[in-house]
Amino acid sequence: MSLLKVEDIHTYYGRSYILQGASLEVRKEEIVALLGRNGAGKTTTLKTIMGLVKPRAGRILFKDGDVTRLPAFKVARRGIGYVPQGRHLFPKMTVLENLKTGMRDQSDAQQLEGVFSLFPVLRERLNQLAGTLSGGEQQAVAISRALIKRPDIILLDEPTTGLMPIFVFKLKEIFKKLTENGIAILLVEEKIPFALSVADQVYFMVKGKIEYRAGKEELQGKKEILIRYLGVEV
């Protein structure tokens, strides 16, 4: 059963026609990777789902409700979390203060223990300025801030950018735990081997359109697909 369904979305930036009829879906407890070359429209897809950019046509359905025209804060309240590229932390605020920006009420504050179980290092860094953390620790704060709102799905834009290999490996474990806890993931990722290792379904985007969809098993040994749509050989 679909948790999130994007249907024939058309999105513009000014006169630039970015998404040209893009469609995809994410099921419950599923990890979906959206891959494509630079400028294909991947980030715009996430921003459109999140309500940060409004499409001119098409629909976005979430838990059978239409969220296409909702502002971003209402999309978040419906249960969609978002971790943008670059993390967007407040560097001169502490880790705890950054996490509090994702809280709505005391019930959200109670989610901190769950966050610490995923990222134990954050418990030790609560009073440290976010700008002094390592790249991996900053990403942990960004993901935790989204998880505090108890989303049903989390959108992640280039989560491995700037991370050391040890934390990239840690992310694999985190993703597994999230899906085991019922949270789906829609992932935009530049590290193709990482994306293919975690995703259940992969969508390939070319110039604002989804040109190919495949399950993880279908892509094994099919280098020609990666070369055709991404220009790389993994």
Predicted features and spans:
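The feature captures the beta-strand-to-loop junction immediately N-terminal to the Walker
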Residues: 35-37
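Helix-to-loop junction immediately C-terminal to a conserved catalytic motif
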Residues: 50
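ABC ATPase NBD coupling module
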Residues: 54, 66-86, 112, 124-127, ...
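Conserved ABC transporter NBD signature motif
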Residues: 58-66, 78, 108-117, 214
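Conserved ABC ATPase signature
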Residues: 129-133, 137
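ABC ATPase C-loop
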Residues: 146-147
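Catalytic Walker B motif of ABC-type/P-loop ATPase nucleotide-binding domains
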Residues: 154-158
